[in-house]
Amino acid sequence: MAYDVKEQVVNCVRQSPIHAIQLDESTDVAHCAQLMVYVRFINEQRVHEDFLFCVPLPARTTADEIFKALNEFYQNEGLEWSRCYGICTDGARAMTGRHSGLVKQVQTIAPAAVWNHCIIHRQALAAKTMPKELCVVLDEAVKVVNTIKSRALNTRLFSILCDEMGARFKQLLLHSEVRWLSRGKVLTRLCELQDEVLLFLTEINSPLAKHLADMNWLAMLAYLADIFDKINSLNTSLQGKEGHVFTAHDQVTGFRRKLDAWCARVGRGSMEMFPTLEDVLEKTALPPSSVQLVITAHLNGLRDQFAEYFGEEPLGNQWIRNPFSFPATARDALSLQEEEALAELSSNLDLKQRLVEMPITRFWLSVESEFPHVSAKAMRVLIPFTSTYLCECGFSALTLIKNKYRSRLQVQDDLRLFLSSAQPRIEHLCASKVRPHCSH
């Protein structure tokens, strides 16, 4: 069945005029490095995304080994590198090395392939920089959580205490650097259970109890919970299927504009956009000025980091987003033939209504027969992945299928059946059997 599913997906990729890939590598429960690859292609006038393959890698996951596995699959399955127009990875050196990284090696044989640094990883990197004061509070908050969660006895005792105090929650969340959304959820839960945590740490004579009795510390903790909650919302909006460069840029641009607005309001002493912090300031009677400088420094740092990692959207492709209204400078990247076709397309009011009614990728595929040149040019921009979200979902499935009880499992076929949207053609498989199995 797995072979049949693979054949369906590979055949669609072979027939697609263009395609793009996203890939990532991770280590499974048996300490074996696994390379995960997803593909985006065109089939029946629609863009499809599907699992391409997952293979184990040698002990050293170098760029050469990753490229070897990737290229070997392309050659064995008859896929054409010349049709690959996008590759999305994280920013690891093995992927992005200037001279011998994976991306460089792929672009040597697929010069049309555009590299996209996973936008979710970029967002996570941009959010890491913080003033020293906030870093200290974050580290201490993680120690508080780990003091309770690292020992089963402490966890049970804390749960009993929360139950006796009628708390909404009875457990803290364990912080993990690996998971994107971990930090914000941990801090939010800690703020919600701060009274219970203070009482518990006091009862076990932990030196960390002093932090939860410090009003300034609590205020900065509340701010961190609020700002990471907002960053988590951005992170979540960047996840999902069928995203393209324009939707991703819109989400990031919206967040950057919010940062500008928050900076201005904090400068005026207003903290209303940070409800947890505002609640702490109200309960403790602390003036906003007590945390104003730290928050301003952090927000300014976030603005600078987002500007560095994302930059400004190039205007040359605005005609793809809206061929009926775009800056005149966007015409500079078009040939005469493409500009004439775009002029004709933009004069068709029926097509204007069609753009409103369907996703942008379907719109450009729907006009392929009438305007093949601009349609192809638009799809080359829209086909690349903007994140490795699907690979991360695949690794979650990998941990579910290949666990400590099945650590020697050869997981490739199981993953394909679990992750692929293609269904095994059962009737075709049964008909192809020369000798059916008889019942015993």
Where are these regions (language model features)?
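Alpha-helical structural modules in large enzymes and assemblies
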Residues: 1-440
